Amino acid sequence: MVSELLLELFSEEIPAFMQKNAEEGYLKIFTKIFEENEIFAKVQVFAGPRRITLHATHVPKVILPKEEEIKGPSIEAPEIAINGFCKAHNVSKLDLSTKLRNNKLYYFFVKKTKERETKEILPKIIIDAINKYSWTKSMFWGCYKIKWIRPLRNILCIFDGEILPLRFGHLSTNNITYGHRLTNNKKLEIIDFENYRNKLLENNVILERLKREEIIKVGLLELANAQNLNIKQDVCLIEEVTGLSEFPIVLLGKIPQKFLELPEEVIVSVMRTHQKYFCLFDKNGSFAPYFLFVINGRFVNTELIIQGNEKVLSARLADALYFYKNDIAKTLESRLDKLKSVIFHTKLGSLKEKVDRITDICRYIAPDNIDLIMAAKLCKSDLVSDMVGEFPDLQGIMGYYYAKHEELNEEVAKAIRDHYKPQGLNDNVPSGNATLLALADKLDSLVGLIIVGETPNGSGDPYALRRQALGIIRIIIENKLEINFINLISFSVSLYKVSSNSHLDSVISFFEERAKFYFKNDYDITLINAVLDLNLVDTKFKLDTLKEFLVQDVGKQLLNAYKRVSNIMGNQKITGLVDASLFSTQYEKELFEVIQKISQQIIVIIANKDYQKALNLLSSLLKPITSFFDNVLVNDSDPKIAQNRLSLLQNTCEVFDKVAKFCRL
């Protein structure tokens, strides 16, 4: 016989961004804990703004007894081990049997479980599962000792058509739930899951998150098409408004024409970030004076709701327009003094000091680039503008528009706009002068914060230094910047007027670790260790070349040849030079001649960055190395000859090391 379990945790508003994770998390937890208790049920979890619901079908009414054979210690084990096994399973030695396993006798114990009624064990299982899910943040409320994401108001729990009694803190289970908070907030008596879902729907609550999401997507598309407009895909915003609404309905509002003089990004920020509205665009991609929004519930007078949302948006845009007009009345340069009163970091001074360092770094990289140096000087000025003070996500973007209003060079304006890029792995790296400005800004922050001890550790990275380092690495590699990065780091460290050596080493070490992290998505770690240095463009080219070379037959054979040499050498460090007069075979002579021939050539080729040619030249060692080992005994009875042969092999390793650290492959 099987039954159905229905559990609803009814609470105050659950943050929208946590609902999807809670749905997935509780599904895993309940499925696992059921299986551990021999309850093999089909489990579903639904998350919404005010409820987390579990529905389990095919739940057995009775857990049948079973036998499990448990292996213990061997019969030859010390008595203390045997007694410990007995104590752990609450049995005596007389209850044990012996069986032969791998030609050895072991004690065994047959553990028998009793038949159990599922309803007797479910309360503990449910409480354990509720407590097991770890919310990103949770809270206590009142004088109760339970904690959850938001205060729980009710717990519905029905098993096999009856209330399953359990207590969670101060709450006892019942068969009651509630409809939509604004339109149908009344008690609903529930019989089973089908009755539960239908009654919620009748009272303006759609249980399934994915169904609510689909309703929103369809509504957005239909209203956009009705206006002959387009809507850009915004997965994150759709997920967010899905989590804000139990019964979503999409409506269309209009933006007054006077606000369209604002930069498009300002209107989008107000609408998307602050109001959770969707922007519309015409067929040419231009911003349209309309917006879409999602309301929570079915209301009679939607026209009044539209007017209310238009009024709220107009008020926000009026503020933005006021800020914008105030800001363009001042130049970016006139704001520099104000940066002196804004702290970048308590130990690293003001934003004005940071701007000065960024400018110095840009001047160091490109001393003749006037546009870059101007952009560096002005890149943080918009941070003290009214607009960015109100809408921080517009930093850089407003600097671009203010620079354009001042009729500054387009390159200066673009560099100011894009110097925060890339912001995350999915963001594009900047181009043009913004490339070097972004590099300088991120490098200054990273160097300064490492100097004052803010290096990330296992518990956190509050200043996102790992992300900034990856941003720098991507900027250099994707823009193929040929710069001496270690010298640049050294210069940046010197701007802080501190004892530089230890700090320089710390910064370099940090970048090396982040470079390994960056490259390991595409390359084996042994390959990375063989070629990594902070000439990042060079490293990328070496990795590509060596990766391709080592999958070829000649590459595999050459690596094996190197390992034969390396295995003989071990950790020995031979100090003597090779003495050709001590050669007693032609194979020693042939190997030595090839080494002498290619050694200097490889240095020149590597300097010219022709790594494929260097590997091809290195391959000329394959035949003489093979012949040497096939015909020569390294440990000759004459110690001088043996030592000379070791020196020859060391020379061989050194030639390989000019191309890559083959010992790490």
Swiss-Prot record:
Enzyme nomenclature, EC number: 6.1.1.14
Coiled-coil intervals, chain numbering: none
Gene Ontology CC terms, in alphabetical order: cytosol
Subcellular location: Cytoplasm
GO biological process, one term: glycyl-tRNA aminoacylation
Reaction(s) catalysed (UniProt annotation): tRNA(Gly) + glycine + ATP = glycyl-tRNA(Gly) + AMP + diphosphate
Keywords from the named record: Aminoacyl-tRNA synthetase, ATP-binding, Cytoplasm, Ligase, Nucleotide-binding, Protein biosynthesis
Entry-linked PANTHER family: GLYCINE--TRNA LIGASE, CHLOROPLASTIC_MITOCHONDRIAL 2, GLYCYL-TRNA SYNTHETASE
Family: Belongs to the class-II aminoacyl-tRNA synthetase family.
HAMAP family linked: Gly_tRNA_synth_beta (MF_00255)
Protein name: Glycine--tRNA ligase beta subunit
Gene designation per UniProt: glyS
